[in-house]
Amino acid sequence: MPPAHPRYAAERSDLRDRLDAATARLDPPFGVVDLDAFDANATALIGRAGGKPVRVASKSVRSRELLRRVLARPGWRGVMAYALTEAIWLAEGGVSDDILVGYPTVDRTAVAKVAASPELAAAITLMVDSVDQLDFVDAVTAPDQREPLRVCIDLDASWKLLGGRLHIGVRRSPLHRPEQTGALAAAIAARPGFRLVGLMAYEAQIAGMGDAPPGHPVRGAALRRIQARSLRELIGRRTAAVAAVRRYADLEFVNGGGTGSLATTTTDPSVTELTSGSGLYGPVLFDAYRAWQPTPAAFFATSVVRRPTPDIATVHGGGWIASGAAGADRLPEPWLPAGLHLLGTEGAGEVQTPLAGSAAAGLRIGDRVWFRHAKAGEVCEHLDALQLVRGDTIEDVALTYRGERAPAFL
């Protein structure tokens, strides 16, 4: 019996029929979330977390309505925001009273607003990795003239070899060794106006790197070996860093992991909570994971507007490219109907995208082609709303950040 996954031809055909029927009165471009897939992914992610709570990564959702939907489910607790201005907007909108800003901030207006509000100061935790950031905050608002600010230390989770000459992972925090983390904890504890409540270590080389890249089995096997060794190293170092920090503060949480590493990060006894977001929408990049692949749940529709040749169909738009190192894996994928691909010489275009493949000849002017974005929340930068589909019916409409006319957080 084949897995219940829309990558299989019959199920993809059924999905196309359902989405076309549900949105028949809408004109592309527009976005859709398949609620059955979204909810199933939310449940599966909690199952992979092994009993630890999961904080939802807002950058991978970018819709307050869908964030509320996730947080109403068992196992999900709190938000990881990507900007302090966003965290304020989410808190004031009643999305959550537990928001961790995943990155340092130098937004003076936002810092001053949090510092002046007992409610915001209690709900929002700032990220720091250096004394310079503490100095910046103090320059904005004096310690004796503000609410105590909650802070979390960001530990570098990358794997360094050969004395640091070989770096595997991303360039985030300068704090790599436990003693460095402990030193910052001591500095925070000695300063008025701050309260150290958490530690975070995001293992991007495990959580954000697919270990089964299509067509590259040797590379995949090598990645899995590297990831396993990196995880072993990180568990020991993160445990030591947590111990060093706990000498100066009674931590409320130790955060780690992402969609691609929930099942492994949860095995680290020093970690008390996890983070996930991309797995809710199931974007293309997560097709390259072996242990678990989310069911595709988010799509955007385009229309066929021309037929330059009998075997090519061209859609209007389509070029919604993902961030990160430039490459083919950042392109959106034409998903429905099955049997379409981008042209290597043109890719996904700003205004039009030609498509070839076995399904191209059967497409007519006005037909729809459904794409999946390479990443998750970034698709919402192009959309005012997401049509929430269940079966072949639009059950509701969720505004995106853009649709709510939110400030430009990034």
Regions flagged by a language model, labelled:
Residues 57-203, 208:
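Active-site-proximal beta-alpha core segment in soluble small-molecule metabolic enzymes
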Residues 294-301:
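Short coil-to-beta-strand transition motifs
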Residues 307-410:
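C-terminal accessory subdomain/extension
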Residues 157-282:
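Active-site loop/helix belt of alpha/beta enzymes
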Residues 23-34, 97-101, 119-126, 166-175, ...:
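Glycine-rich tight-turn/loop motif centered on a GG-T
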Residues 1-116, 404-410:
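A charged N-terminal "starter" segment
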Residues 21, 26, 30-31, 48-53, ...:
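Hydrophobic/basic alpha-helical segments enriched in Actinobacteria
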